[in-house]
Regions:
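A charged, aromatic-enriched C-terminal amphipathic alpha-helix characteristic of glycosyltransferases
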Residues: 344-396
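A conserved mid-protein helix/loop that constitutes part of the nucleotide-sugar donor-binding site
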Residues: 17-20, 220-234
Length: 396
């Protein structure tokens, strides 16, 4: 069989905003790719979005369409392995290569195995007033079992793992951490975005003269806002102000409590971003903050972090976050909130100097080099040809 035979790939994703990134990533010589965007809001949807893209509902109607379509492809990529995609894997034929393009939410939001490791002490205390979060995993299992009469998402995911050829992600440390709790498919390095996707052409620099401090990236409880607050109150310089993006987040009661806590302690020095901005407007908002704190204990908000580091913001992460160790391993200057923040407040060192900014820019360019995918692509191509040859030999 010729090594130049076209590889037919199909991509299943739930968020159309990532589609341009994925299409650019798979504009590969010798590959033909098709893309399916899952519609989780409507029923019985099947419509073309272009020559190589279609939108399909995530109900049984759409599931049957996708499973039938998979028969024509060599390899399938599943972006964020939710319940629908896991069930499609479980019901698909044995010859198809399945790759799980990891996001994070499909693990952290579907199981309580990490509950004791991703929340700070002050945030954990809030669970007593947030039953919708404290018992979220139990509620979801009951909902799927009693109401939908379907396996819970984590059950579907676990069953699909044996049929997945590889999990694709670029933070190996995170894969090692999760593997201690859940058996994962073999890991291979891959990133479905490039430098230009994260850092658009013409990106400006952070306003180093500003005294705005960014806290977190959303209204999700994994931001550990309550654990950041005590250290912010130690900043006596009233010229400093604090911005909390709270646009995204599932639990309105948590958001309300965080706003109340911050207002009570910081008064008019704190503002909350709750409205939706265009991407350009959001980037402009980020660049107003020469200091940023992301106290997640797990990978989250990585696009924000990389963008801010490149534009010149001094970023503080939790010492518990695998992203901190990953960035340091790759030579990027990032700081520990629990250790460095108060010292830097006292020494008035909450911003980066120009030399360190340039250093981070160079390292992030290296980190986001798309050519790092080449080894994994070659391995996937080899596996496709092995299976094609096996199928030909079986027929013969």
């Amino acid at each position: 069989m010729s090594a130049k035979e076209t590889i037919n790939s199909i991509h299943l994703l739930s968020d159309v905003k990532f589609l341009p990134w994925i299409k650019r990533t798979f504009a590969l010589q010798g590959w033909s790719s098709y893309y399916i965007v899952l519609n989780h809001k409507e029923k019985k949807v099947c419509k073309d979005l272009g020559d190589d893209t279609m939108e399909v509902s995530s109900d049984s109607f759409g599931e049957s369409i996708i499973i039938e379509k998979l028969r024509s492809y060599d390899i399938a990529f599943h972006y964020l392995l939710n319940n629908t995609k896991a069930e499609i894997i479980n019901k698909s034929g044995a010859d198809l290569i399945h790759c799980w393009c990891f996001y994070g939410a499909e693990i952290y939001q579907q199981t309580n195995l990490f509950r004791n490791t991703i929340y700070g002490p002050q945030t954990r205390k809030m669970f007593w007033t947030l039953p919708e979060k404290r018992f979220r995993y139990e509620f979801r299992q009951w909902y799927y079992f009693f109401w939908k009469r379907e396996p819970s998402p984590i059950s579907s995911l676990r069953r699909s793992i044996s049929k997945i050829y590889a999990i694709l992600w670029y933070v190996e440390e995170e894969m090692e951490m999760i593997s201690q709790k859940i058996k994962l498919p073999p890991w291979k390095f891959f990133q479905f975005f490039s430098f230009d996707d994260i850092i658009p052409a013409g990106t400006g620099n952070t306003d180093i003269r500003s005294k705005k401090i960014l806290i977190g990236n959303s209204a999700t409880i994994e931001n550990n806002h309550a654990d950041v607050l005590p250290l912010l109150t130690a900043i006596s310089d009233k010229e400093y102000s604090f911005s909390l993006p709270l646009t995204y987040g599932q639990f309105s009661r948590y958001k309300s409590q965080i706003k109340s806590k911050y207002k009570r302690k910081l008064g008019e020095r704190v503002t909350f971003l709750e409205g939706h901005l265009s991407l350009e407007e959001y980037y402009s908002f980020l660049r107003k903050h020469p200091t940023a704190v992301f106290l997640h204990y797990r990978q989250q908000g990585l696009g924000n972090i990389l963008y801010l580091l490149y534009t010149g913001t001094k970023v503080y992460l939790s010492q518990h976050n695998v992203v901190y160790r990953w960035l340091k391993k790759n030579g990027i200057e990032v700081f520990i909130f629990e250790v460095d923040f108060l010292r830097d407040v006292q020494e008035q060192q909450l911003t980066l100097d120009q030399k360190m900014i340039q250093h981070n820019q160079e390292k992030i360019r290296d980190l986001l080099d798309h050519q790092r995918n080449d080894i994994t692509i070659a391995e996937l191509e080899a596996e496709v040809y092995v299976r094609k040859n096996r199928k030909v030999n079986d027929i013969a």
